[in-house]
Amino acid sequence: YPPKPENPGEDASPEEMTKYLTALRHYINLVTRQRY
């Protein structure tokens, strides 16, 4: 599996949160595609 994106935490900037959520969505897509 690809590495799971790091959660930037409570004090992250909006840009960091957006980047994290985008990376997380991409990660989930990769993992679910491999499983099914």
Swiss-Prot record:
GO biological process terms, semicolon-separated: feeding behavior; neuropeptide signaling pathway
This protein's record includes keyword Transmembrane helix: no
Modified residues (Tyrosine amide): Y36
A GO term, aspect molecular function: neuropeptide Y receptor binding
PROSITE patterns: PANCREATIC_HORMONE_1 (PS00265), PANCREATIC_HORMONE_2 (PS50276)
A Pfam family the protein falls into: Hormone_3
Keyword terms: Amidation, Hormone, Secreted
Top-level taxon: Eukaryota
Range of residues in the leader sequence: none
Cellular compartments annotated: Secreted
GO cellular component, one term: extracellular space
Main subcellular location: secreted
Similarity field: Belongs to the NPY family.
Protein name: Peptide YY-like
Lineage: Eukaryota, Metazoa, Chordata, Craniata, Vertebrata
